[in-house]
Amino acid sequence: SAVLIATISAEEFTWAWADPELKNTAAARLAGNLARFGVDEVVPELVRPHLPLQLARGRQLPHLALPILGIWTLAGTTLADGRVGLVLLDAPQLQLPEPTPAATEATLAITPPAWIDAARARAAYGSFRGVDV
């Protein structure tokens, strides 16, 4: 399955839930959960419909969608109108194998960006991968 989460045009990043041409499509419908999460968890970047592209890239906003929607493969594609569509893909072939101690250790050794709560990120990783952190 594929979930369209955002579009990129020129210097603007637009969440799919806010894109007038796409928001009612089956592919973009799930993206509305990102805005709801943003309201519930006070994440302004998920609630603002349009953001400067540099901000979206700097904050790695598309990657926020992965744990929220529970889909872990992010891809870009060119839409019919020439914009870039950011899509989350899910299929059995894309599922991660069971975590190994070495993989868990390597993942937890990565320092998250300063604007991310490291303890919360570690806890989320442990929860999603079913490992003690």
Regions found by a protein language model. Give the residues of each.
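N-terminal membrane-targeting/anchoring modules of bacterial envelope and secretion proteins
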Residues: 1-30
